[in-house]
Regions:
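Phosphate/pyrophosphate-binding catalytic cores of soluble transferases and nucleic-acid-acting enzymes
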Residues: 1-155
Length: 155
């Protein structure tokens, strides 16, 4: 029977070392569910595994995207489940490691289909942000959806 092993917790508590040591003992690969470690340009403050750690055991979803690429939890969930199915053809175990618990939950329980945001909308909002700043966007959100604004942690 195939098994997923999850190692989760906050940044810099030793998840990487523990997961590598365990993966070497049980001969398996590691899938990261740390949403900040996906991006090549985000090495500082994310505790991304060092090169000498990455060569010890095969890692997936580590610095595989650019911050300029659109990548959301729905895409991650689809990619991770596909990879898990492939890895289970050759491995009895897979280690999931990270601190982005919503991303872990998306693997285990699935996630509602997140609709794609048209690139024109993303571009328009980024332009508004560049030209008018975050305070303007917060005010706009409060006007358009006061209930969500009150529930969110953005103010």
């Amino acid at each position: 029977m195939n098994k997923l092993i999850s190692i989760s917790g906050p940044t810099a508590v030793g998840k990487t070392k523990f997961s590598i040591d365990l993966a070497k003992k049980i001969n398996c690969e590691i899938i990261s569910f740390d949403s900040r470690q996906f991006y090549r340009e985000m090495s500082i403050g994310t505790a991304v595994p060092k090169k000498n750690e990455l060569i010890q055991v095969k890692h997936h979803f580590i610095q595989h995207k650019s911050i300029h690429d659109y990548y959301n939890i729905n895409q991650f969930s689809i990619d991770a489940k596909k990879l898990i199915n492939e890895l289970f053809k050759k491995n009895k175990y897979i280690i999931l490691v990270g601190g982005s618990f919503l991303y872990l939950k998306s693997i285990i329980y699935g996630i509602n289909n997140v609709p794609e945001i048209p690139s024109e909308v993303r571009h328009a909002l980024n332009t508004e942000f560049d030209n008018k700043g975050i305070d303007y966007l917060r005010k706009l959100l409060k006007e358009l959806d006061p209930k969500y604004y009150d529930l969110s942690l953005i103010h």
